[in-house]
Amino acid sequence: MTSLSWITLLAFALSVAFCLGFRGLAREWHLIDIPDARKRHDGNVPLCGGIAIFLSFSAATFLAFGVSGHANAMALLPGLVLILVAGVLDDRFNLPVAPRLAIQLLAAFLIIAITGLTQTYLGLASDGIETAAASTPEMLIQVLTGPLFLIIALAFIVGLVNAVNMSDGVDGLAGSASAAAFFWLAVIGFGIGEHRLGLQALALAAACLGFLVFNMRHRWRARASLFLGDGGSTFLGAALAGFILILASGTAAVAFPVLIWIVIVPVIDTLSLIVRRMSVRRSPFSPDRQHLHHLLMDAGLSCGQTAVAVMALNLLAGAIAYIAIRFDIPVWPMLLALAVPAAAHTLFVLRMTRGARPIVTASMAEANPTTKPNITYPGATS
């Protein structure tokens, strides 16, 4: 059996085993999701999926490579641990937004510092530029370095952490979408010769699939028996951001704007939500039911169909990134083409929300008891 096969199978098997083992412990630790006005699921569901995915990925990686795996990917672990712990604490104690963001920023800084990332490849240079001009505006758009790189990298990590977290609202959605993204990161890693990084990304995809045995709705499972929790969704977002930044650096770097395609679905949905919430003077982190998955369910899809649809969109977006890399499509067209999914998302949101009554949050409903909240949807898990 090849290393590719056994590492993938090991990560999957460990994930299933850890999910089974931690379900009882999660109840003892009070890591459970209790149904309320916003969460419409049956019974108290353990929030230990993220812990299981992290442990299975880490164990499979160390058993396969020891400490000789891809140096930057191994260096992600301290920051990922901090993100995971902060998310688990949020699951347990419902932390305020400010300390959550502070911990996420610290974890993002650890990821950048320990991996030694100092630049990201943009690939936006024009052909035919004279060498003498390469030290001024050319270098600015070809390779991003210095304080500007640090600011953008921090924003990217924290942004993707929260984008994946916000997308975790339907059984199987965040896990399957993340598995699709890690799959394409693995394929791209193998394609540019980063085999250890590719194996580690594939191990994470397999660990997500092991979790989906308990979280994805299918013929033999009517509803999820295990949730990712904030610890899991934020960990997956940080891991995706870290792998993308690693692939966008080094001697065989892939252009960052091309890699963005792999996570474009949660990125566009989150940016759209932030703009819409702030336009009505609401916090970007306030809950509502205006996410893409909510609107897909409003359009008539079931919970399971919604998860599959979003996963398919992620697979398609990742395939576009791979095709661009495989056939050396210039970066500028790929960057400009990001307007297509953004426009499609905007048109879909406008169509689904046209004529809809204003969204009412739980806090607004408490302030005015005569107002009926409009924040839930059958089948949504968070």
Report residues per predicted region.
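C-terminal membrane-associated helical module and adjoining short loops/tails
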Residues: 246-382
